[in-house]
């Protein structure tokens, strides 16, 4: 068997539905957003959107409509999922707890019926008498809305018009009346029917209109006083209500297709329209008042307001603010102004909401060489196309920064005796010290009486008896707070320079070369208590008091030069308690005693970024449990700070890290800053609970995130990225992208807008000897859109487009790889293409082009003609493996720098995906699932090992390990196939067994091995093996990892118990939602644990946790089973959350 754990690292971000309503209360205006399986509820306030609740549905939200039945004070929500679960939800709040109550639910799936090509449509009668659903061709399903019915019952009405494009309920009709656009062999028509609840059938409608525009695609029902419906087409907008017919054909809407609409005014006099190019229009209905007081429609008018993200849905909030929900780019809040700006636009973006979808391709790279992967995705499409750089870490939010190069240390001070908060920041430089006064958010340089400013400061701070201390290279200075004056000064007897110092509120230890001096701080006096000589020079020291020692430290920790040791000495006698040889040649640069979760530790950082950490016994001074991690490559400085009332350590280096403890294990979290040399905590009036951070050039004041999370950076391309790969030698990314150009009158094409491929620093164009340009059988006509494909070379640091190489006309770039071939020392970018002509069912020719990028130039090294489309390529044992239409082909690289075919495998329909491991090749087919090949180096050919005989339409594949293969298919499922090496017959051996099945509810475009969290960090006890990330159309990033059988069984037991305790919204069974479901079959999920459900254990109340753990058997690693406690499971689940 295969046991896997699948979990979300980034929830879906693409918006596929949005509505405005009074859902949380009669007064609140709410925005509800659907992001695939997630429903987000916001309140619209004067300051913007305030999140109220996020609900995870056990289903893909296909319909989301609000309605208010008579007698309700606020709106109810109707939701239908893609697996046909329907529910009516209500918002209930009591005190702090918010609940989404399921008022009614049911499944409205039919046993037979062909799901409509135009998808699921759900509508609600304006009088709230019924819900109408168009799920299958030829059927209209009705759910009567009875007040007290807990179960949603539905019945079907036969619909003669099989191909319905869009349908709506009309306003102001005695009986519920639908209006729809349908297509038949003669064209498209509009028709209306009355729905009779009693007879459960249609009656003739009030009007119909035959032969409307051939591209008519949307119906908008207009409220009273107008009534009737607006039909939106590609070129025209028409209004019908039986008596009146009005049509306009504004040229402005022809450029693109209108895909969404939203009513602005309750009386339906204005509508927003959004098209596929991201343009926003206003449709105005002008009224004419008749003599008898009735109102009729006088005219229709369309105005272009401006450009937004490409809208999937629009909803008007209030005061000219519109939410633009996007699937292809970031969603936006925009303001509609009365007057246009210089560009003639009435639209101003107020806020953007990051969307990673659709993730078309991605790669994991460790750009900063930090042992932590960053994910770079090809996201978005058309003008919303971008690269997204995603990394996990703790964010620092910058509040102020000052250009100050050369800072060597910094400390906060409270200059007056009765202050609670810091008001001063002391900065140390080589040979000088500067003092900054903090006044609110203002920062100004000042002088402190009693302080010296012409020497470097090693330590500065508030100490006992209302005094300040400044330790410089020359002396230790004690200064009274009121009045500010030097009251005591200690110098080394021979006036030698102090090299290192450490101080707490009443003790000082300084090192002068090999000598150590211990001083105590008394009122207006520094008293030398003892001194000693070490064998070697002291490199670093620390006397942080631990435990409840009244602020006094009985211990002194030091790190020495020469013998590279860390030692614990007893104060005041400097007696050696423990000596720890660290080994190696790199000296300790920073040492720190600290307490995490009431356990004491000694941390010691070396000059090469390595960190040793030990358990510390504060009674005996003994060190235990020695462990080592690598945090960076530069010397590391350790400083403590407090956040959320726990102690944390900040390790300053070229790779800043926060160290904290969770479940008595140290956790190392990346901080999203390039480098930090020094830091100190700062808590001033203007900057509460902040950190001051210094790098080589700047001082920054900021606040720190409480938890680590994904941070996303956007590099806009303004065109569609398709494929990405990373090339370490040239420190570049290769990206395949395509832009849209329009045929102009001269026969050439022009780009619609500036984008990455037209703005590159340099560019080149393919000229191929293989295809003469005249062979193109297809002539484009004026105004037609053509795709132009490019290879972009993008700098890994600045993400600047260094070079753009344009492929031939009609040539689509499909696959990309960066690799070395054979004995050739060069690394190449290799691109696989196809010549795409509209009249060909599948491409008949394409090419493989080998490029080399060096010294800022891109050269074509070789090209190879192929008979088909090069869908996928991978480097394979120094050769190039490619899939071309139905063939898998291996090329070797000759000394003449040419590609020569070595062998082929033909048994596929369309080989779209290739993954390799050792000599094994996994092939993902368009419709014939996966196939495993082995390459035989001796014979130089492929052998078919086994295949999955289930007809899965593949969207991505990956090799988990030698025997297990992961696949994603087009009905949003994941499955794992296993090679059965132990099988006795050839027949059995040739079958890949499906051992894992799971409904993900997401369309996976790409799998890749890698992780978003720190790797190689010493010890980990997570029970998982390996990590495969995946990216989906909705912008979700997920992770699949393998479990041992015992862990799988524990988590499966836990999952079943959680399902009894956690009530799902809409009363949808978890087992139903996760069951593997295609048009052919439905099977229960197996071999997969739903990590999102497991992790929800951390969010439930303590009593519910107790319910889950009751009588649960748990092996704590000793091999003995015992009853688990809630804390055992919290520990287990927290471990699992760390893998992403």
Swiss-Prot record:
Quote the Gene3D superfamilies the UniProt record gives.
1.10.150.910, YVTN repeat-like/Quinoprotein amine dehydrogenase
Annotated stretches, region: Interaction with CDT1: 2-768
Per the record, the covalent cross-link Glycyl lysine isopeptide (Lys-Gly) (interchain with G-Cter in SUMO2) lies at: 1121
Which parts of the sequence are annotated with region: WD repeat beta-propeller A?
13-356
**Stretches for region WD repeat beta-propeller B:** 391-708
Q: Which GO molecular function annotations are given, in alphabetical order?
A: DNA binding
The UniProt PTM text for this protein says: Phosphorylated by ABL1.
Intracellular or extracellular location(s): Cytoplasm; Nucleus
Q: Which parts of the sequence carry N6-acetyllysine?
A: 1067
Region described as Interaction with CDT1 and CUL4A: 771-1140
Keywords (alphabetical) are: Acetylation, Cytoplasm, DNA damage, DNA repair, DNA-binding, Isopeptide bond, Nucleus, Phosphoprotein, Repeat, Ubl conjugation, Ubl conjugation pathway
Sites of Phosphothreonine modification: 1125
What biological-process terms (Gene Ontology) are attached? Answer: DNA repair; proteasome-mediated ubiquitin-dependent protein catabolic process; protein ubiquitination
InterPro entries the record matches? Beta-prop_RSE1/DDB1/CPSF1_1st, Cleavage/polyA-sp_fac_asu_C, RSE1/DDB1/CFT1/CPSF1, WD40/YVTN_repeat-like_dom_sf, WD40_repeat_dom_sf
Please give the pathway this protein is involved in.
Answer: Protein modification; protein ubiquitination
Gene Ontology cellular component list:
Cul4-RING E3 ubiquitin ligase complex; Cul4A-RING E3 ubiquitin ligase complex; Cul4B-RING E3 ubiquitin ligase complex; cytoplasm; nucleus
Q: Which residue stretches belong to region WD repeat beta-propeller C?
A: 709-1043
Write out the function statement from the record.
Answer: Protein, which is both involved in DNA repair and protein ubiquitination, as part of the UV-DDB complex and DCX (DDB1-CUL4-X-box) complexes, respectively. Core component of the UV-DDB complex (UV-damaged DNA-binding protein complex), a complex that recognizes UV-induced DNA damage and recruit proteins of the nucleotide excision repair pathway (the NER pathway) to initiate DNA repair. The UV-DDB complex preferentially binds to cyclobutane pyrimidine dimers (CPD), 6-4 photoproducts (6-4 PP), apurinic sites and short mismatches.
| Record's comment describing the protein's domains | The core of the protein consists of three WD40 beta-propeller domains.
Family statement drawn from the similarity comment of this UniProt entry: Belongs to the DDB1 family.
Spell out the subunit comment: Component of the UV-DDB complex which includes DDB1 and DDB2; the heterodimer dimerizes to give rise to a heterotetramer when bound to damaged DNA. The UV-DDB complex interacts with monoubiquitinated histone H2A and binds to XPC via the DDB2 subunit. Component of numerous DCX (DDB1-CUL4-X-box) E3 ubiquitin-protein ligase complexes which consist of a core of DDB1, CUL4A or CUL4B and RBX1. DDB1 may recruit specific substrate targeting subunits to the DCX complex.
**Name of the featured protein:** DNA damage-binding protein 1
What is the species of this protein? Answer: Chlorocebus aethiops
């Amino acid at each position: 068997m295969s046991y896997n754990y699948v979990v979300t690292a980034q929830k879906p971000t693409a918006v596929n539905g949005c509505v405005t309503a009074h859902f949380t209360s009669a007064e609140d205006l709410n925005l509800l957003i659907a992001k695939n399986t997630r429903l987000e509820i916001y309140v619209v306030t004067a300051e913007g959107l305030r999140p109220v609740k996020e609900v995870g549905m056990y289903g893909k939200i296909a319909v989301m409509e609000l309605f208010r039945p008579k007698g309700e004070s606020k709106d109810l929500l109707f939701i239908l999922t893609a697996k046909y679960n329907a529910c009516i939800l209500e918002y209930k709040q009591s005190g702090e707890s918010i609940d989404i109550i399921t008022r009614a639910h049911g499944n409205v799936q039919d046993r037979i019926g062909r799901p409509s090509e135009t998808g699921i449509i759900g509508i609600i009668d304006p009088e709230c008498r019924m819900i109408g659903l168009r799920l299958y061709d030829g059927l209209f399903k009705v759910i009567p809305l009875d007040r007290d019915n807990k179960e949603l019952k539905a019945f079907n009405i036969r619909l003669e018009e099989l191909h319905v494009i869009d349908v709506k309920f009309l306003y102001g009709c005695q009986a519920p009346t639908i209006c729809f656009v349908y297509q038949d062999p003669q064209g498209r028509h509009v028709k209306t029917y009355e729905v009779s609840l009693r007879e459960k059938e249609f009656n003739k409608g009030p009007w119909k209109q035959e032969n409307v525009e051939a591209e008519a695609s949307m119906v908008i029902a207009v409220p009273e006083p107008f009534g009737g419906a607006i039909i939106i087409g590609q070129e025209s907008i028409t209004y019908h209500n039986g008596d009146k017919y009005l049509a306009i054909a504004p040229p402005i809407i022809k450029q693109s297709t209108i895909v969404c609409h939203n009513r602005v005014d309750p009386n339906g006099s204005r509508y927003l329209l959004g098209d596929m190019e991201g343009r926003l229009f206003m449709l105005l209905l002008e009224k004419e008042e008749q003599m008898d007081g009735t109102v009729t429609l006088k005219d229709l008018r369309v105005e272009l307001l401006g450009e937004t993200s490409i809208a999937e849905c629009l909803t008007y909030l209030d005061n000219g603010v519109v939410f633009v929900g996007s699937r292809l780019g970031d969603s936006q809040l925009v303001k509609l102004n009365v007057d246009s700006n210089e560009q003639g636009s009435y639209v101003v973006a107020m806020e953007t909401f990051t969307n990673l979808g659709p993730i078309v391709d991605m790669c994991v790279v460790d750009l900063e060489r930090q042992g932590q992967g960053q994910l770079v995705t090809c996201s978005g499409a058309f003008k919303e196309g971008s690269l997204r750089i995603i990394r996990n870490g703790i964010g620092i939010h910058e509040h102020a920064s000052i250009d100050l190069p050369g800072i060597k240390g910094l400390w906060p001070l409270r200059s007056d005796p009765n202050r609670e908060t810091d008001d001063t920041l002391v900065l140390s430089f080589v040979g000088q010290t500067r003092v900054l006064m903090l006044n609110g958010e203002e920062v100004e340089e000042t002088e402190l009486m009693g302080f010296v400013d012409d020497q470097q400061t090693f330590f500065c701070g508030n100490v006992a008896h209302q005094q300040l201390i400044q330790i410089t290279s020359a002396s230790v200075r004690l200064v009274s707070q009121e009045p500010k004056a030097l009251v005591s000064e200690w110098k080394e007897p021979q006036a030698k320079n102090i090299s290192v110092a450490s101080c707490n509120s009443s003790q000082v230890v300084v090192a002068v070369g090999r000598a150590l001096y211990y001083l105590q701080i008394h009122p207006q006096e520094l008293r030398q208590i003892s001194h000693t000589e070490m064998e070697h020079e002291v490199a670093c020291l620390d006397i942080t008091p631990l435990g409840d020692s009244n602020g006094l430290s009985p211990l002194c920790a030091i790190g020495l030069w020469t013998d590279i040791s860390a030692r614990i000495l007893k104060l005041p006698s400097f007696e050696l308690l423990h000596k720890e040889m660290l080994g190696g040649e790199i000296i300790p640069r920073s040492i720190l005693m600290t307490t995490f979760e009431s356990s004491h530790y000694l941390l010691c950082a070396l000059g090469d970024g390595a960190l040793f950490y030990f358990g510390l016994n504060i009674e005996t001074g003994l060190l235990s449990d020695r462990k080592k991690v690598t945090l960076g490559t530069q010397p590391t400085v350790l400083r403590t700070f407090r956040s959320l009332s726990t102690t944390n350590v900040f390790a300053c280096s070229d790779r800043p890290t926060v160290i904290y403890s969770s479940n008595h294990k140290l956790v190392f979290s990346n901080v999203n800053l390039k480098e930090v040399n020094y830091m100190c905590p700062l808590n001033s009036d203007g900057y509460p609970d902040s950190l001051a951070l210094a790098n080589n050039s700047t001082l920054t004041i900021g606040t720190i995130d409480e938890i680590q999370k994904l941070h996303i950076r956007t590099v806009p391309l303004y065109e569609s990225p398709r494929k990405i790969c990373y090339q370490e030698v040239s420190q570049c990314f290769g990206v395949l992208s395509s832009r849209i150009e329009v045929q102009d009158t001269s026969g050439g094409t022009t780009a619609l807008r500036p984008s990455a491929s037209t703005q590159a620093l340099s560019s080149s164009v393919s000229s191929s000897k293989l295809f003469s340009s005249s062979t193109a059988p297809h002539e484009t006509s004026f105004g037609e859109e053509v795709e132009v494909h490019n290879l972009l070379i993008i700098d890994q640091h600045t993400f600047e487009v260094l070079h753009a190489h344009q492929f031939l006309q009609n040539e689509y770039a499909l696959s990309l790889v960066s690799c070395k071939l054979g004995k050739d020392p060069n690394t190449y970018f290799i691109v696989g293409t196809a010549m795409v002509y509209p009249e060909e069912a599948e491409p008949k020719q394409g090419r493989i082009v080998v490029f080399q990028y060096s010294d800022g130039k891109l050269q074509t090294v070789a090209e190879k003609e192929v008979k088909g489309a090069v869908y996928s390529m991978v480097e394979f044992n120094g050769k190039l493996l490619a899939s071309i239409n139905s063939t898998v082909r291996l090329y070797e690289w000759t000394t003449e720098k040419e590609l020569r075919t070595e062998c082929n495998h033909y048994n596929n329909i369309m080989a779209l995906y290739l993954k390799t491991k050792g000599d094994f090749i996994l092939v993902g087919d368009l419709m014939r699932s996966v196939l495993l090949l082995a390459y035989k180096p001796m014979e130089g050919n492929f052998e078919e090992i086994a295949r999955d005989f289930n007809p899965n339409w593949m969207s991505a594949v990956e090799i988990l390990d030698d025997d297990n293969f992961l696949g994603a298919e087009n009905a949003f499922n994941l499955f794992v196939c296993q090679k059965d090496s132990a099988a006795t017959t050839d027949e059995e051996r040739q079958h890949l067994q499906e051992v894992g099945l799971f409904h993900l509810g997401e369309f996976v475009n790409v799998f890749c091995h890698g992780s978003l969290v720190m790797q190689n960090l010493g010890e980990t006890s997570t029970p998982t093996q390996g990590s495969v990330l995946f990216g989906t159309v909705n912008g979700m990033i997920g992770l699949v990892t393998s479990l041992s059988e015992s862990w799988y069984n524990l988590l499966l037991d836990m999952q079943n118990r959680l399902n009894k305790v956690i009530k799902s919204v809409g009363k949808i069974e978890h087992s139903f939602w996760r069951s593997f479901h295609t048009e052919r079959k439905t099977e229960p999920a197996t071999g997969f644990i739903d990590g999102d459900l497991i992790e929800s254990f951390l969010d439930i109340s303590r009593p519910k946790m107790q319910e889950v753990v009751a009588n649960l058997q748990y092996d704590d690693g000793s091999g003995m089973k015992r009853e688990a406690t809630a804390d055992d499971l919290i520990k287990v689940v927290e471990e699992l959350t760390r893998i992403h």
